[in-house]
Design a protein with these regions (language model features):
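Conserved alpha/beta enzyme-core scaffold
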Residues: 1-322
């Protein structure tokens, strides 16, 4: 059964007020800006935003008044530094920020994907990340007196130094988003999706979520997806809806399709320093455009063409036969 719907239908159905939404799981690339803009257009409220490095998408959703909480490792403009709306919200108390690291966020999502309440780590020990943070709990290792075997040698004949299980650990609480939105290169109508490049925590975020929306640069026949199973990182049975949206990740890059629009990130930084400027920016780039096609039309054909991939780098052909 086809899961292909419009962006308007997908957001209306899958993102009611008050839910937690994971966005921008692939770090600086393939951030689902088109989906985020539809969330803004539909004036969703009370959202919790989840993501490692969301770049400026979180800042836009915050500026529109859609979010009340952020669970992230970093929020800002990767190119320029501060995200003014996020900063204003935290300083004024209208936005709650829960601080995780990239790795601890990955652990939280992975725990939910595995169906376990937490995963252990040592990486937060000695830092203040876990202080007054409900996502961390100090625990004792049940194997504290066990010495790990050093029989496995490293390449070159050098033995691994003996390791002992540290008694003190941090448990990172599982995190299951109500909705995970991901942008991929291509998918079929059933939601089976090809993706390549930097995954970030894409796979963990999809498997941890209660519902999944896949946004694809193009919808292709199922035969195209099945011809390359190793790129099918999202199986259709996990997906609730799929949307075709060309340039849906702009201004972030999509490997093999278009590059990062650095000028747009600079312009956003320059024109959103105040609340009034941010509202004017949203009016021009979100509220006054009906969909992604209208959004891209504002740039003109030359600007869009400049973003298209010029230097191609193809993978070697793969033989899947036996």
């Amino acid at each position: 059964m086809s899961k292909l719907v419009s962006m308007r239908e997908a957001i209306a159905e899958l993102a009611p007020d008050g839910v937690s939404v994971a966005l921008g799981l692939q770090m600086e690339q393939m951030i689902p800006f088109a989906a985020g803009h539809e969330i803004i257009r539909q004036k969703k409220r009370g959202l919790t935003l989840i993501g490692p490095i969301s770049d400026i998408l979180f800042d836009q959703v915050i500026a529109a008044g859609c979010a009340e909480r952020v669970i992230a490792a970093w929020v800002g403009n990767v190119m320029m530094g501060s995200a003014y709306n996020f900063r204003r919200g935290v300083e004024q108390g209208s936005l709650k920020a829960v601080n995780l690291t990239n790795f601890s966020l990955a652990l939280a999502l992975q725990a939910a994907a595995m169906g376990v309440p937490f995963l252990p780590t040592r990486t937060a020990l000695g830092s203040d990340v876990a202080r007054d943070n409900d996502f961390f709990a100090e625990i004792e290792s049940p194997f504290a007196d066990t010495q790990i075997s050093e029989s496995a040698a490293r390449p070159g004949g050098r033995g691994r130094p003996p390791l002992r299980e540290h008694a003190k650990l941090h448990a990172v609480k599982a995190l299951s988003p109500d909705l995970t939105v991901v942008h991929v290169q291509r998918a079929d109508r059933d939601g089976n999706a090809h993706c390549w490049g930097n995954f970030g925590v894409l796979i963990e975020g999809v498997r941890a979520a209660k519902r999944v929306l896949v946004v694809a640069e193009e919808i292709v026949d199922a035969d195209v997806i099945s011809s390359d199973p190793n790129r099918t990182v999202i199986p259709g049975f996990l997906v609730n809806a799929v949307v075709e949206c060309r340039y849906g990740a702009h201004p972030s890059p999509v490997q093999g399709y278009y590059g990062r629009d650095n000028a747009f990130f600079r312009q956003y930084h320059e024109h959103t320093k105040t609340q009034g400027e941010s509202e004017a920016w949203l009016q021009r780039w979100v509220y006054d455009v009906a969909d992604r096609r209208a959004y891209m039309n504002q740039f003109g054909g030359c600007r869009v063409e400049d973003l298209a991939v010029k230097q191609h780098a193809y993978a070697a052909q793969t033989e899947f036969g036996y």
